[in-house]
Amino acid sequence: PYSMFQTLTKGNGLMGPQTWMTPQERYDVIHYLREKFMKPMHPKYQSLTDEYLAGLPKVNTVVPITKQVGRDFGPALASQLGRDVSSVLTVKLGDAHSISYNLHTMDQAAVWRGGFLKLRGTQHYRERGESVPEVEGDPISGLQSWRWAHDGGFDYPTEDLLPRGPMPSKWMEYRGHHLHGAKVVLSYSINGRDVLEMPSKPAGFRAIVHTLHIAPGKQSLQLSVAQLEGEGARRGFLDPKATTVKLLQAKKSVAERLAVIGFPAKGPLERFAAAATFGETDGLDWSFDGKGRAILTIPASKKARLFQVIRYSAKTDAQLLSMAGYLGHLKLKNALPHPAKLLLGGKVRWPKVITTKGTLGKADAAYVMDTLTLPAKKPGKVWFRTSALAFFPDGRLAVCTHGGDVWIVSDVDESLANLKWKRFAAGMYEPFGLQVIDGLVYVTCKDRLTRLHDFNEDGEADFYESFSADDDVSTFFHAFNFDLQRDAAGNLYYAKSGQYTSYALAGSVIKVSPDGKKREIHCTGFRTPNGMGILPDGRVTVSDNQGSWMPASKVSLCKPGGFYGYVQTHVHKQRLWAPDGGRIDHRKVVPPETFDQPLIWMPQDFDNSSGGQLWVDDKRWGPLSGRLLHTSFGKGWLYYMMLQEIDGHDQAAIVRLKIDALTGIHRARVNPQDGQVYATGLNGWNGGGRKGLSQGHVHRFRYTGKHANLLTDTKILADGIELKFNFKLDPKSATDASRYKLKQWNYKWTQGYGSKQYSLRNPGKIGQDEVDIQGIEIVGDGHAVFLKIPDIQPVHQVKIELNLHAVDGSPFKELVYLTINKVPGP
């Protein structure tokens, strides 16, 4: 067991360390293996009895009790809630009260007292956070219904609604939330009428208060504010001046009265839910329905209306009368906060600007790596798991974290000596992509594209705008939205996970119009597309990772309507994820006969978990400018690619820069001020990756101006391969066939996890083929060679190892991988 524990903790061979597991979970794995596999085969298996346990050595070390670090997400956190509601905003109300809104309906998902959210097993605390946010505390009985009516009722048909997406805009449109200090103002429309809503919990009284500003509209609105079901309930209205509990029955209610649902039908109350209104209440009407709902009707109006709904749930007559007393207090105070006055920002929440000093790499090569040091002491105990980055035109850097932050870094100069980090936003839903457009930060979240506004220009976001809501949001932890790319026309692109999701169409690339109003599926068939890129002509690239229906890691150059390999034929045994939430029978999914081939395949030891791509077009980045770069989340490496198009078929070769990042990198951008490449990423679920990667770093890959001998191009020709270099070759070594080692192989596309390497010459046989070179020619002025391979043909993978010399005698060793999709005709 001890050696197994060491393997799980530190890794061994091809198995990476399972750092995401707690010690208890590692012991659970060991116990499972012991009982399930070893027990039947081990004749001397020792049963776990009290006597056996008593005979074990005594532990004389005190195990420290670890306390959960308190994260500060600001006043609200976007997430899912449990495994049923995939997009919520949970608001801290104060006094350990919290409310969660379903952003697909703007109905309440839950309201409770006793804490915020249970997050210990999620990505906010664990590398591989497979748990989901749950209510931390006790749901408030009777107040779980805060629900808008549509089509004349609350039990409207849902068959034609998106199962994991927002309602039709004619019913509800969520616009975002504003922050003003600790206050949160929600902006949305219901049945065509604009609503501003600010939830709160009054000091000294355990009620939930909703301040509502309802815009004019021709349609009346209905809102269920409380609900208690059961036989023998009493329903009626309480005069706020009453000194005893006597519920009045009226054909038409008076808005100033309290609407009450209580038990039992007679005698002192044992439990109740009550609601009241305050403010501009003329024309508001209370009613009850057969399902125990207290319903507020807001009439059509030519004027806007500002009022509060106060909701309270307790057990006794005295507590109900205390609510009447609270209403009297409100009337004496005669003050009603106006949400519209809280939309442009309040006081700074995180005033501290943190200064760090970066580390410069030794400028002894053409390309070196610098490190932008992350803040050590951070406000809110932020876990700096960096997930994406983007630049402002002036060179300021936006960096987001997996936990939901955006930070702005200024003074990103050549020396990196005085980096200033300022927290700009927090509480977003698993950001994995960033863009800066016209000075505004756009964030790819799990449930939408969010656009951040700083109205009062204090360096913090005041409005988290829902720029484009995703129409299919899965509740499984692995269902990420990746990256954010922008074409010349202003369209935005991001990629959705394929496997381990409940999506109706898994593994899609989503194209969003410049105004955020139009969404379309650009292409499909990706398993875990953790990264994208975009070429100068507007075509997008997408990476993928080895797994089911994915033979190896790859990068694809995508076309509209393309299909790139992943087929949704898998389902979780407990149905935590299933095609279209289980609406599609995965057993009846018929895989296509083929798929669109990638630019490049890559074996696991070269890139086990691919990141995004970056087209570098700044000449200040030296000889590798003007080409496509690739990143590796699993290895923490940066690569450059050489593209070739033959008769409409695209293919590539790829070479790794010999620099080891300190973390897995999957997002890269060019700084417009210095022309250098910056990259970021994190670590987590990374079996087979490079060991020792950190949970987050930001690096600069800098061109120093020094010369580097480089392989600059590869071309597949009718009878061989041409290799070009940026230096003149030594003819003797360049024409020596022993200086080149070429191997080739294919992968098999199946529903199994990954693929072995298969012979091209003997299909079905596991193994690589040696590639014979029939001749070598120096091409042109000595900067290129042609390797004559008469039987060259399409193949998934070619591996070329070079061991050459330049004409000045300097050695040149390189490893390059190619994919051949097309060989030109003679």
Annotate each language-model stretch with its function.
Residues 179-209, 704-731, 738:
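Surface beta-strand/loop "capping" patches
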Residues 220-222, 226-307, 749, 762-763, ...:
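Trp/Gly-enriched beta-strand surface patches
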Residues 337-339, 705-711, 730, 793, ...:
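Acidic, Ser/Thr/Gly/Pro-rich low-complexity segments and short DxT(G/T)-type signature motifs
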Residues 41-86, 313-370, 375, 824-826:
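N-terminal pre-domain segments of enzymes
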